[in-house]
Amino acid sequence: MKIRIDIPHHPYDIQIEKGCMAQAGQWLRELWQPQKVVIVTDNHVASLYAEKVKLSLEDAGFQVAVFDFLEGEERKNLTTVQKVYEFLVKQGLTRSDGIVALGGGVVGDLAGFVASTYMRGIHFVQIPTSLTAQVDSSIGGKTGVNTPFAKNMVGTFAQPDGVLIDPLVLETLGKRELIEGMGEVIKYGLIEDPELWALLTGLNGSVESILEHAETLIEHSCQVKRKMVVEDELDNGIRLYLNFGHTIGHAIEATAGYGKVMHGEAVAMGMVQISKVAEEKGLMPAGITQSITEMCQKFGLPVDYENWEVDKLYQALTHDKKARGNTLKLVLVPELGSAIIHPVSLEEMKDYLVK
């Protein structure tokens, strides 16, 4: 299946197909002329797929080198970026060459940032290997790295030339790594897609049920992301809906220490906490918090952060990218399948941190 991201200045396709990673070279040959390519990945993904993708690209006429770094959210920083820059220079990459981001969200965010800043921008594509990356972070052109102050604090908007999604690679994920991606999938059902929510309701929450329906879950999620990105590429309007649960979720990730709480886990806890307080304030319908909680728990996602420290979380919130002055654009779900922006002051945001 192909989904067109029809952004006027940079349209591209998401290709979703079981087993398509084996044809990565042929796919890329349709996008780029043979040239130098650097595969950016982490050491875990490299051990599984780097050689396979490298050989496929070489068979298609590309000159390929591989850069891998130690896996983990804590490596998504400017230190790693500098190391990638140095590798690209040693390989002699020019503005006519490109980067293949092969991995999960950490790899995709970092490799995209490198591609968008090296020589003021070179071509890149995404081959996501985690559920979170396949349904969310590989699509839409947000790139970035973390700082000690906040998640993704330094970044760019830079669209890839294409996204290649192979649902079969999810079978090599660990249980926790697969389940955390469901945080984003659940979010899509809540903010835009009641049909997806109904599908999730019918699943039993097991790893087997996720893998069996992975292609459908990915397609639904990508269609929602496509709609938001095409209408609002630079995150000024409806694309903000994609941040439901992320305001508190990002604060949890930052205060826990990057890599301790996975992104989808933090999003799940963020959705539950925001909904609980918003429901108490009459801003979200009665019973929705219970529905979100039960859905997250069914798939094995955490719904309560055990190291809840209001002061630390609030400090992290002050660096949120959705803040404009002293106002933060909070995303709420007034009914299943729709979302709204609810501006709150940073002072009011303290209410949403009360357990």
UniProtKB/Swiss-Prot annotation:
Domain of life: Bacteria
UniProt binding sites for Zn(2+): 184, 246, 263
A GO cellular component annotation in the UniProt record: cytoplasm
Single GO BP term: amino acid biosynthetic process
EC number: 4.2.3.4
The protein's required cofactors: Co(2+); Zn(2+); NAD(+)
Molecular function per GO: 3-dehydroquinate synthase activity; metal ion binding; nucleotide binding
Catalytic activities: 7-phospho-2-dehydro-3-deoxy-D-arabino-heptonate = 3-dehydroquinate + phosphate
Gene3D superfamilies given in the database record: 3.40.50.1970, Dehydroquinate synthase-like - alpha domain
Pfam families: DHQ_synthase (PF01761), DHQS_C (PF24621)
InterPro entries: Dehydroquinate_synthase, DHQ_synth_AroB, DHQ_synth_fam, DHQS/DOIS_N, DHQS_C
Keyword Transferase: no
Family: Belongs to the sugar phosphate cyclases superfamily. Dehydroquinate synthase family.
Matches recorded under NCBIfam families: aroB
Function of the protein: Catalyzes the conversion of 3-deoxy-D-arabino-heptulosonate 7-phosphate (DAHP) to dehydroquinate (DHQ).
Official protein name in the record: 3-dehydroquinate synthase
Protein's organism: Streptococcus pneumoniae (strain 70585)
